[in-house]
């Protein structure tokens, strides 16, 4: 019996070091037919059961758990394994041939496998009539990989995998393992050293934190009921359509008795609220799996798995489906820039810098203590793009807000001289990231038609939303960080000093049409000591609420799509805390309820009047009437839609002084209705305004033959539209 086993091989198997288990285990041709070797540490006996029912007891080998015996030259067999606690009847994992096709492996190695989680990861499948799970992981520099889990007592000796050399992929079909099984990969590095057990980078389901295992996902697809939405999505998300985004952190939007809602509970509460408020979209802070809740999801490790914090992957699909049925789009924040250093994650995955750059000047982000993806490696960029498509296709997500784009575009981002590596031309631009982002956006347009990508890009990088064919990055929209910074600084000033900073109010129109913009009042503006949006407003309580209402009125009438973080819509007075729910009890206060009503009305106004959204990206949709009245801190402008759309007049008074008889030219005569007034009593204001309507007078002003004499409420915004 001992001549059936090489001593070096048996030691390597017993020590979980052997890198080519298929060369030893399973049935191999012999002089008497086939020699079957199996390794089941802890087993007391093993019998091979042939297809005709005959049984071949296997003899114990030189190491505990090793068994071998002679089988006929042909025919299938199963194993009957005697354990101390009972008997297991199963197929032999080492009786199956290579699983992934050569074409799959080619696509993986080229970074072009767009359904990557159908090839890699854990897929519950049937092979040769046997049900089980196919495990596959990219680890080209590992000397050995085994899958460990609750199905093999987490024993790295039990299920070593086969290396498919052309792509660096290790694979194994494990019979009888199905959805719900917990697993990880146990790898040895290129020199044989054992690495920390790794979660599956392509797992479609993950264990609830603080657990770090991956879970075999249920392959049953969600039964979607959103055909109507998907058929009209491209129109709903077109550049000339209204887009008002409500950004939320799913774990802290609403807490009941200190507990997070699951996806179904969130859908029950959130969707009716968003619909009532008039938002067109919800934007979820990252829902990909992440180890540390305090990162808010911006340091993810499971880029193919919706986080288990809110339930199952199908629960997330149900949430999206229900949003769509109510006419609400779903955008998710997505992080392809960097990842955390947790030992069970992507860091030094196979004992080398696989997903990250090896040089810390390229591969380590000191601001966040994270590792930076190597976008120049085909397999890594392909991994990220496949993650994007996973959420856009599998979960019908309508858009990705791509996080930290500026940190990817510049090699010297947040680095001093000598701390970064120039590109091949000696410059700071990251050519590899540029190529990655362009390909991402091209792939999204082709394979997720109607979906959008939104860049959080904080610099003046040119052409972020320009077509790739024109040298741009190809995003659909970009956050207008300049507008946000300038206007928040302006509104935070005492009105006495605003006259000296008037340009901060008007400068955004200089570049408003250089990109397709979203105006973001995001979570970033209510954390890290910045306080709340209401807390930034100067003055006493009356002035603070009036300033907030005026600021929101300005935001909703300024060119650009809108994004508002949860809590801002009712004037949350404290900084956001992800460990606590929003202070919904404040809606018992008429002042906060008034802000909420104002935001609801602004959303409906914005959607109702094409002039406020149809030409957000076209200079013909905006005309200054008054942009230089710094002394009174007043601005006035016309918003214009397409031919036949009524114009809208917007007037803003950023002082607490009432302006009487403030005359403004208008492009047509007749009655102009006051369709919005931030000082209305229903919003908590003093009800100062123009009695609901003003009739134009034949007095020329601002290049127009007709003009309106207006009362401008203090710290207020009024919007007028011509009757009929």
From Swiss-Prot:
Molecular function GO labels: 1,4-alpha-glucan branching enzyme activity; cation binding; hydrolase activity, hydrolyzing O-glycosyl compounds
EC numbers: 2.4.1.18
Catalytic reactions on record: Transfers a segment of a (1->4)-alpha-D-glucan chain to a primary hydroxy group in a similar glucan chain
GO cellular component: cytoplasm; cytosol
Single GO biological process annotation from the record: glycogen biosynthetic process
Disulfide bond sites: none
Keyword tags: Carbohydrate metabolism, Glycogen biosynthesis, Glycogen metabolism, Glycosyltransferase, Transferase
Gene3D superfamilies: Glycosidases (3.20.20.80), Golgi alpha-mannosidase II (2.60.40.1180), Immunoglobulins (2.60.40.10)
Enzyme class: transferase
Pathway per the UniProt entry: Glycan biosynthesis; glycogen biosynthesis
Active site: 403 (nucleophile), 456 (proton donor)
Glycosyltransferase as UniProt keyword: yes
NCBIfam families recorded: branching_enzym (TIGR01515), PRK05402.1 (NF003811), PRK12313.1 (NF008967)
Function: Catalyzes the formation of the alpha-1,6-glucosidic linkages in glycogen by scission of a 1,4-alpha-linked oligosaccharide from growing alpha-1,4-glucan chains and the subsequent attachment of the oligosaccharide to the alpha-1,6 position.
Family classification: Belongs to the glycosyl hydrolase 13 family. GlgB subfamily.
Subunit architecture: Monomer.
Name this protein carries in UniProt: 1,4-alpha-glucan branching enzyme GlgB 1
Source species of the chain: Xanthomonas campestris pv. campestris (strain ATCC 33913 / DSM 3586 / NCPPB 528 / LMG 568 / P 25)
Lineage: Bacteria, Pseudomonadati, Pseudomonadota, Gammaproteobacteria, Lysobacterales
Gene: glgB1
């Amino acid at each position: 019996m001992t001549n059936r086993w090489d001593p070096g091989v048996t030691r390597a198997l017993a020590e979980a070091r052997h890198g080519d288990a298929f060369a030893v285990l399973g049935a191999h041709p012999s002089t008497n037919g086939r020699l079957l070797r199996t390794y089941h540490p802890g087993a007391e006996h093993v019998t091979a059961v042939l297809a005709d029912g005959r049984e071949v007891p296997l003899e114990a080998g030189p190491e505990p758990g090793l068994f071998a015996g002679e089988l006929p030259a042909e025919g299938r067999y199963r194993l009957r394994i005697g354990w101390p606690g009972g008997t297991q009847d199963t197929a032999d994992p080492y009786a199956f041939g290579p699983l992934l096709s050569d074409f799959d492996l080619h696509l993986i190695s080229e970074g072009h496998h767009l359904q990557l989680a159908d090839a890699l990861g854990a897929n519950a499948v049937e092979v040769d009539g046997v049900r089980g799970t196919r495990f596959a992981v990219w680890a080209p520099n590992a000397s050995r990989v085994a899958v460990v889990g609750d199905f093999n007592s987490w024993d790295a000796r039990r299920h070593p995998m086969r290396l498919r050399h052309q792509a660096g992929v290790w694979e194994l079909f494990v019979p009888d393992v199905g959805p719900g099984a917990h697993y990880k990969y146990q790898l040895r590095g290129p020199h044989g050293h054992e690495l920390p057990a790794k979660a599956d980078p392509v797992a479609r389901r993950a264990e609830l934190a603080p657990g770090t295992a991956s879970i075999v996902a249920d392959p049953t697809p969600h039964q979607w009921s959103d055909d109507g939405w998907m058929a009209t999505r491209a129109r709903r998300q077109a550049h000339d359509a209204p887009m008002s985004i409500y950004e939320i952190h799913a774990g802290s939007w609403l807490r009941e008795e200190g507990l997070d809602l699951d996806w179904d509970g969130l859908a029950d509460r959130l969707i009716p609220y968003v619909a009532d408020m008039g938002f067109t979209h919800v934007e979820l802070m990252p829902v990909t799996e992440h180890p540390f809740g305090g990162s808010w999801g911006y340091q993810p490790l499971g880029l193919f798995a919706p986080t288990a914090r809110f339930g199952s992957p199908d629960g997330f699909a149900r949430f999206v489906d229900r949003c769509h049925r109510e006419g609400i789009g779903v955008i998710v924040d997505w992080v392809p820039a960097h990842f955390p250093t947790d030992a069970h994650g992507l860091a030094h995955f196979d004992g080398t810098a696989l997903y990250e750059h090896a040089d810390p000047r390229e591969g380590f982000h000191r601001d966040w203590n994270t590792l930076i993806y190597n976008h120049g490696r085909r397999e890594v960029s392909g991994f990220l793009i496949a993650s994007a498509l996973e959420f856009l296709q599998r979960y019908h997500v309508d858009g990705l807000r791509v996080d930290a784009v500026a940190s990817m575009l510049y090699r010297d981002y947040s680095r001093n001289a000598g701390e970064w590596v120039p590109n091949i031309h000696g410059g700071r631009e990251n050519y590899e990231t540029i190529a990655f982002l362009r390909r991402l956006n091209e792939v999204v347009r082709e394979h997720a038609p109607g979906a959008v990508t939104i860049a959080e890009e904080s610099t003046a990088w040119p052409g972020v939303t320009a077509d790739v064919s024109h040298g741009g990055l190809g995003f659909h929209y970009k956050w207008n960080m300049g507008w946000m910074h300038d206007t928040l600084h302006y509104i935070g000033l005492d009105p006495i000093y605003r006259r000296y900073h008037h340009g901060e109010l008007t400068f955004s129109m200089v570049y408003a049409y250089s990109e397709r913009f979203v105006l973001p009042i995001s979570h970033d503006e209510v954390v890290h000591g910045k306080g709340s949006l209401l807390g930034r407003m100067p003055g006493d309580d009356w002035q603070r609420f009036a300033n907030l209402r005026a600021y929101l009125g300005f935001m909703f009438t300024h060119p650009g799509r809108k994004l508002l973080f949860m809590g801002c819509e009712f004037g949350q007075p404290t900084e956001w805390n992800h460990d606590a729910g929003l202070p919904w009890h404040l809606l018992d206060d008429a002042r906060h309820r008034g802000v909420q009503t104002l935001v609801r009305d602004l959303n409906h106004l914005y959607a109702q009047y094409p002039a406020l959204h149809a030409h957000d990206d076209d200079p013909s949709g905006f005309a200054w009437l008054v942009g230089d009245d710094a002394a009174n801190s007043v601005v006035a402008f016309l918003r214009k839609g397409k031919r036949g759309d009524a114009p809208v007049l917007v007037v803003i008074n950023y002082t607490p002084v009432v302006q009487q008889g403030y005359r403004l030219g208008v492009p047509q005569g007749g009655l102009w209705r006051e369709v919005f007034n931030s000082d209305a009593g229903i919003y908590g204001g003093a009800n100062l305004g123009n009695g609901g309507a003003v009739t134009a007078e034949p007095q020329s002003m601002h290049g127009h033959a007709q003009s309106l004499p207006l009362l401008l409420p203090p710290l207020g915004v009024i919007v007028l539209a011509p009757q009929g």
